[in-house]
Amino acid sequence: VAVRDGRILGVGSKESLAGWGSAEVDDRYADKVLMPGLVEGHCHLPEGGMWKFVYVGFYDRRGPDGRLWEGLKSFEAVAARLREAESALAPDATLIGWGFDPIFFEGRRMDVRDLDAVSPRRPVVVMHASMHLMNVNTPMLARAGIDRDTDIEGVTRMENGEPSGELCEFAAMFPVMRLIGSPFRTVGVSEDGLRMFGKVAQWAGVTTATDLVNELGDEGLATLARVTAEPDYPVRIVPAASALTYAGDPARCLAKLEEARRLNHGKLHFGMVKLVVDGSIQGFTARVRWPGYYNGAPNGIWVIAPSELDTLVQAYHDAGAQLHIHTNGDEATQLAIEAVDRALRRSPRRDHRHTLQHCQMADAAQFRRMASLGMCANLFANHIFYWGDAHYALTMGPDRANRMDACATAARAGVPFSIHSDAPITPLGPLFTAWCAANRRTSSGRVLGESERIGVDAALHAVTLGAAYTLHLDHLVGSIEVGKYADFCVLEDDPLAVPAEGLKDVPVAGTVIGGRPLALREG
């Protein structure tokens, strides 16, 4: 590969490239494998900064400093880790944990009694792995003004009518977030958080990554522009403006997005807008069609009211923005497809590439409709491993769980698609994500929907050029072609030569960004 000015000048033999003139030969990767820099089409910058809080997830997980945090298999273990962290906090600080998910604990739900036992005086907040639910203790409920008379959808209650401390979706969580300052978002755009994210991305071979909910705050924008412009910052960032932040005011969001676009440079690309229609399947807040949740749980929560979605989609579509729309359940997917269809009928637009994010329960008919409308999908392949067994037994049941995150069906329907980690929901690692799509093995080893497996080549396309396409960046990244950024992932082995089962274990040896080789940073 010949590189000039950070871009790919040519690809071929030394003889075929000789016409470009003299060159300095860099053969440091002579015994490695170069592939296009990996593209994470759905993640969030807090994947780095979240580690300033206490990890209380079920699965083992490695932090940016290299420490392996053991997964917690009981409520008692969660409480013990929280108590250990609480003992080191300043007296007036809020204790914040993240990564918890009650679905792994045989039907038991966390409530105020569990967290009051951690601290009866200090406010305690535990964000679920999905980021769509949280648990808080009695002091936090009191400070947030949430009591038995609070009338907000998503405030769950105990048998005596008092709040249980479990808050489902953004309206219910807002009184708490308002007090603690939305730390799960702001840590992502702090300088330390950005640098930690860059380190994690580089370990994973990622050279382009999204921040798929960005509030466009002035301080965060300034930090993003400054840090990403540093020559050795190892990843290109593609943020999406959070429509939710602007409370149904598209004009205000679009004005702020236009300000952000003025900061764009080679490693910062504003222009997308994120809408969130429903919640989390494993949190039972996603909106699903008949026959509903397998365990009989009531249907989920509309984060955007159906009566409002058309107006929002139309406004952003008419403004020329590309929409990335969170739909987990198939009822939410149907609503989003219909909203995009109506927007296109009113205002036809070529090559819009509006993308449904997660899109986990879409069926073949919905994928065919998406293809006819020029829509894309970004499927949450990692869910198969982390929550596949729970979906099989509790949320969707065998039939529907076997067709979740249906990459093969999307491909047959002609829908351009990518696959993702949604980090920090699951760890950033596109080779693992590709492994999930190619193998569809759950954490117990069950194959969940063998007919929805895709080949390794298709899975790798989904985390390179496929993801770039969904971001409108396929002219710049995603493949090793003349004119594109000279971004590469350096591997120890050829991912197309190892068995599909070994794809997740191919070591990343380094990355190249704009022609600059970057050694893996220690940590």
Annotate the PLM regions.
Residues 48-51, 232, 270, 351, ...:
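Short, solvent-exposed loop/turn segments at the edges of secondary structure
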Residues 2-4, 8-254, 275-315, 319-328, ...:
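Divalent metal-binding segments
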Residues 20-21, 268-269, 473, 504-506:
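Short, small/polar residue-rich loop motifs at catalytic or cofactor-binding pockets
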Residues 41, 373, 486:
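An anion/phosphate-binding loop that grips the pyrophosphate of nucleotide cofactors and donors
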Residues 265-285, 375-385:
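Non-cysteine beta-strand/loop elements that form the S-adenosyl-L-methionine
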Residues 181, 314-324, 328-354, 358-359, ...:
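His/Asp/Glu-enriched, well-ordered alpha-helical/loop segment
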Residues 10, 509-510, 519:
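A structural microfeature
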